[in-house]
């Protein structure tokens, strides 16, 4: 391995100066690891060759790739040309023979990362998704055989997404239903945030292992908190200030979108912290509630505009006379439930850190 060209060697060959390299390492770690990890990122890139990656596509809309190529920190060109060796991706590479996959599997047996976008259909022996004249189901099993680890990009690969919506005539399934003997990290979202995708790759390059995962197989660094808890509209939820109808006074004042269907209280993602388009905005900031696209089964859970629960809410600006005995009971239950979920989450985090 020492004779192989390291990621740093590749960058120097591309004309990158030492100063620019160190700046790059600092910026690369900022979204996911923090600037203090820049020395570790630099050491990893100086001592390890680019990680070989095979990226396959099944039943999907390619939105994960569309998100990935818009990463700002790091830029996708730096990821693809310097950090990893993207040996095969039929969307992001020039036309090449399918033999490229076989060559990578032979050359880097047990060392390459298999990234999967989309999912396999099981019905009719996988004939509902044919890539290069072969069922994607068979290609997926074959490519995973000698992989070091597997990345499930997006909700299609992680949960099944709309392809698996009832009645699911193609029997589309998430990839963990097919690949059961490999370390796997799920990066759900429809699509995932670009910097979340490149952040996962950065972590794996830096530490040579998968990041810490939650019980559903998602990286805790990005999926460890509810969107609701970090949303700038959260104070309006606590104050009982809600948008009741689209374009009402509450909507114009930026009140909480919970009553018009926002799934932020039950969705775990980095949307309210990392945000989209290089930190510019996210759906709730743009005035639309979260649809919970990173959560399993979101596509079959009813309208995006249905309220999560009918339990009454009350806020800090209302007094007991306005709420009434009935409202106090219902609202108290709602707040108790909300507080309980938050407290349980904090205890779980403390337990994980212990």
Curated annotation (Swiss-Prot):
Describe the function of this protein: This enzyme recycles the H(2) produced by nitrogenase to increase the production of ATP and to protect nitrogenase against inhibition or damage by O(2) under carbon- or phosphate-limited conditions.
Top-rank EC class of the record's enzyme: oxidoreductase
The protein in question is named Uptake hydrogenase small subunit
Give me the residues that bind [4Fe-4S] cluster 1, please. 61, 64, 156, 190
Keyword annotations for this protein, in alphabetical order, are: 3Fe-4S, 4Fe-4S, Cell membrane, Iron, Iron-sulfur, Membrane, Metal-binding, Oxidoreductase, Signal
What the record notes about the co-factor is:
Binds 2 [4Fe-4S] clusters. Binds 1 [3Fe-4S] cluster.
Question: What reaction gets catalysed by this protein?
Answer: H2 + A = AH2
EC number(s) for this protein? 1.12.99.6
Q: Where in the cell is it found?
A: Cell membrane
Specify which residues bind [3Fe-4S] cluster according to the UniProt entry for this protein: 271, 290, 293
| Species annotation | Azotobacter chroococcum mcd 1
Q: Write out the residues that bind [4Fe-4S] cluster 2.
A: 228, 231, 256, 262
The entry sums up its family as follows:
Belongs to the [NiFe]/[NiFeSe] hydrogenase small subunit family.
State any single GO MF term: hydrogenase (acceptor) activity
């Amino acid at each position: 391995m020492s004779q192989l060209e390291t990621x740093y060697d590749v960058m120097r060959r591309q004309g990158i100066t030492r100063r620019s390299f160190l700046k790059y390492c600092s910026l690369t770690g900022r979204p996911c690891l923090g600037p203090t990890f820049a020395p570790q990122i630099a050491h990893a890139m100086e001592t390890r060759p680019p990680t070989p990656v095979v990226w396959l596509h099944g039943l999907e809309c390619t939105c994960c790739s569309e998100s990935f190529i818009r990463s700002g920190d790091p830029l996708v060109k730096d990821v693809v040309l310097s950090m990893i060796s993207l040996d095969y991706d039929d969307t992001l590479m020039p036309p090449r023979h399918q033999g490229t996959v076989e060559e990578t599997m032979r050359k880097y047996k047990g060392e390459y990362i298999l990234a999967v976008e989309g999912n396999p259909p099981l019905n009719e022996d996988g004939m509902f998704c044919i890539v290069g004249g072969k069922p994607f189901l068979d290609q997926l099993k074959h490519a995973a055989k000698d992989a070091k680890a597997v990345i499930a990009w997006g909700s299609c690969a992680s949960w099944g997404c709309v392809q698996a919506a009832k009645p699911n005539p193609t029997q589309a399934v998430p990839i963990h239903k097919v690949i059961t003997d490999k370390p796997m990290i799920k990066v759900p979202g429809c699509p995932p945030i670009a910097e979340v995708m490149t952040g996962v790759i950065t972590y794996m390059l830096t530490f040579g292992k998968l990041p810490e995962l939650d019980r559903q197989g998602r990286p805790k660094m990005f999926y460890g908190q509810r969107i609701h808890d970090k949303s700038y509209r959260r104070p309006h939820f606590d104050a009982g200030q809600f948008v009741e109808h689209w374009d009402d006074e509450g909507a114009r004042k930026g009140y909480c979108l919970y009553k018009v269907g926002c799934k932020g209280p039950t969705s775990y993602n980095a949307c309210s912290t990392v945000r989209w388009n290089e930190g510019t905005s996210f759906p709730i900031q743009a005035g639309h509630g979260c649809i919970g696209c990173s959560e399993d089964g979101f596509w079959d859970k009813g309208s995006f505009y249905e309220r999560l629960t009918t339990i009454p809410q009350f806020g800090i600006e209302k007094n007991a006379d306005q709420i009434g005995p009935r409202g106090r009971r219902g609202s108290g239950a709602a707040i108790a439930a909300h507080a309980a979920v938050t407290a349980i989450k904090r205890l779980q985090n403390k337990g994980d850190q212990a």
